C-alpha cells in the first residue's frame, strides 16, 4: 500500500486556464491536464532556475519527488506542443487531490 501524499506548498498563480493550437476549437481536440504541483515544478525549476534541492525544499517535498514532477510536467508540455493538443492548466477552482 503506497504512502499518503504529502501536502505541497504551492505559490504560483496560473495566468490562464489552457493553451491550444490556434484556429482549432478546443472542443475538437484531446486534452492533457497539467496538475498544480507539476505546474509549480515547472515554474520553480525552469522559470526561476532553482536547483532541484532548493525547489523541493520550497514545495515541502523530497528532491526525488520534485524530479519526478518536473519530468512529468515537461513530458506533458512537449506532448501537447508536438501533437497539437490542448494543455489544460490548474485553476484555483479545480479539485486537486494533493
UniProtKB/Swiss-Prot annotation:
Disulphide connectivity of cysteines: none
Spans traversing the lipid bilayer: none
Phylogenetic placement of the source organism: Bacteria, Pseudomonadati, Pseudomonadota, Gammaproteobacteria, Alteromonadales
HAMAP family linked to this entry: UPF0251
Name under which the protein is recorded: UPF0251 protein SO_0727
Cited PANTHER family: PTHR37478, UPF0251 PROTEIN TK0562
Gene3D superfamilies named among the record's database cross-references: Winged helix-like DNA-binding domain superfamily/Winged helix DNA-binding domain (1.10.10.10)
Family: Belongs to the UPF0251 family.
Amino acid at each position: 500500500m503506497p504512502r499518503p501524499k504529502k501536502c505541497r506548498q504551492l505559490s504560483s498563480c496560473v495566468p490562464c486556464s489552457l493553451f491550444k493550437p490556434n484556429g482549432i476549437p478546443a472542443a475538437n481536440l484531446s486534452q492533457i491536464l497539467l496538475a498544480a504541483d507539476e505546474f509549480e515544478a515547472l515554474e520553480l525549476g525552469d522559470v526561476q532556475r532553482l536547483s532541484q534541492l532548493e525547489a523541493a525544499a520550497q514545495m515541502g517535498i523530497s528532491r526525488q519527488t520534485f524530479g519526478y514532477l518536473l519530468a512529468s510536467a515537461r513530458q506533458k508540455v512537449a506532448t501537447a506542443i508536438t501533437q497539437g493538443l490542448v494543455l489544460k492548466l490548474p485553476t484555483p477552482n479545480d479539485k486537486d487531490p494533493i
